[in-house]
Amino acid sequence: MVYSNNDVIQDFGSDLRYLKLLSKEFPTIASASTEIINLQAILNLPKGTEHFLSDIHGEYESFNHVLKNGSGNIKRKIIEVFGDLLSETEIKSLATLIYYPEQKLDLIHKKEENIEEWYKVTISRLVEVCRKAAFKYTRMKVRKALPKDFAYIIEELMHRGPKELDKEEYYNEIIETIIRIGRADEFIIEMSKLIQRLVIDRLHIVGDIFDRGPGPDIVMDTLLNYHSVDIQWGNHDVLWMGSAAGSEACIATLIRICATYSNLNTIEDGYGINLLPLATFALDFYKDDDCTAFKPKIKSDIIYTENDLKLIAKMHKAISIIQFKLEGEIINRRPHFSMEDRLLLNKINYEDGTVDIDGKIYKLKDSNFPTINPKNPYKLTIEEKELMEKLKSSFLNSEKLQRHVRFLFSNGSMYLKFNSNLMYHGGIPMNEDGSFKKVTIDSSGISYSGKAYFDRLEILVREAYFRKNNPIAKQHGMDITWYLWTGPDSPLFGKDKMTTFERYFINDKETHVEKKDPYFKLEDNEKMCRIIFEEFGLNPDVSHIINGHVPVKLKEGESPIRANGKLLVIDGGFSRTYQGTTGIAGYTLIYNSYGLLLVSHDPFESTQKAIEEEKDIHSTTMVLEKEVERKRVRDTDDGEKLKFQVKDLEMLLDAYRSGLIKEQR
């Protein structure tokens, strides 16, 4: 309540005990009043800027650049401050310095003749940009973000008033001293990093950090050190999470994907996992097999020897067969997954090299299966069992992988509601009529749908990793984690089946078809979005769904804006594989106090060109929604929490003034 009536003493009831605890933190009327004033002031600040990225797929260079430039947000700040004062070339140079301060300084030192003058001008400009980036935060919040070595100096320079002529010499002397004692480079680096931090208040990653790109581990290291981030798990993410938990099916699938895209370095160098046992196994059992159907896809910027490619192909085939066997074990163990159509090893005629799929006979492209027993095709050989034990041990004992996956659990979830936005990676299983599909995922026969399905899946995924003292619950959780990768009613996958076997072994492309969930047909339907908002407890009139997973094919006329702006598809398009299909490098989203901005990006060339030639990603910004009144902290989820704190403190004031609680002076 707002304290306004001195004649009324509240009936505090059960709140009194809580207020006594609160009084330990605010022991006097003065301290409680000061906190109320502070919180009330914060509620009236502009809301912080949120940055949404999705589907990074291990492409760390593109990801790092978009993160550093805030989807163009830093350049916008520079233009707001210096738009009429600096040339386009000067703006580009200043932006590049802020993105890559260490590397850019190296180049500056080689070509700048009057480095001291350059330092003076550059430091002054950085201070102005930093002031602009920090204006919407309290001094306390900015102070917490300041680098320790320069905290006092930066704070002094940032709060320099435009009319403080008497202190002009004071501020100039600070900058000149920084230069004179040889700390200018360090100061510029820290200022640049501070600007990067201040332009984005919260980062949302809407799934798929992992996949075929060369550096998911580098992306994860970056996120671990980011000041405020949440993650909505994608299908590729749960595959790595399941592998870190010890799911052999996830491990085999993960290795197969890395082999497909000649990206085994991520496993070996990125996470220190030894793949020599797999190489040895593959050479033993497939030494006379050229494994044509399993030749890896080669990246244009990496050179492989012929022997390298032959070995990867053999490893690729070996782990693929093991994957099919392990998947068969899960499908037979969990009949409620309803995935019997994926049991194909027992449908092969090993004598004539054909397979029966849905009553139709297909010739196999490859019929050499030295490790399959036709009478018991899903049984691992002794050597395969030993191999998987070694690989599992390596995954379980990779300190870096375990650290990254723990971060995915602590900062991630199946979905997130935040400031009237609902974020999830794929879709919500639906029936053709737009109703939520009921799905049975365990032997209890209990069905789940909509939000309850997401909540139940998240519990089970967490059990896969954390229920080490309960082998049955852990195994069920690991099987569910694998199901989220490939299952017909997985919200993260969104298709009726994954036709991995058919793509390897059958030429007929009709067998490769994967039918999308009805959700994806209905995602342009505003009524469906409103039903989803109500299911998740959000106001349909002001909320948005923010989706990843499916690349937007701009070339074919697709739009990322669906259902009259209620659903936004922001597949980042970082994966180079999709850029030929989409026509761009995908979308990111900015949500600031003025509204929603959708940013489309052209492909990123390289970090080297970004630094040396100052080639930023060319981005086009579209204003989706503009607020009539600027959004304040009071209009956000954090604002609601602060309002409750204010209410509690006002109750504490009443308790002090009514004598129910004594001040501790």
UniProtKB/Swiss-Prot annotation:
**A single GO BP:** gluconeogenesis
What InterPro entries does the annotation carry? FBPtase_class3, Metallo-depent_PP-like
Single annotated GO MF: fructose 1,6-bisphosphate 1-phosphatase activity
Catalysed reaction(s) here are:
beta-D-fructose 1,6-bisphosphate + H2O = beta-D-fructose 6-phosphate + phosphate
Instruction: List the EC numbers from the record.
Output: 3.1.3.11
UniProt entry keywords in alphabetical sequence: Carbohydrate metabolism, Hydrolase, Manganese
Coiled-coil positions: none
Q: Name one Pfam family in it.
A: FBPase_2
S-adenosyl-L-methionine as a keyword of this entry, yes or no, is no
What pathway is it annotated to?
Carbohydrate biosynthesis; gluconeogenesis
Give the required cofactors: Mn(2+)
Record-stated family: Belongs to the FBPase class 3 family.
This protein's name: Fructose-1,6-bisphosphatase class 3
To which species is this protein native?
A: Alkaliphilus metalliredigens (strain QYMF)
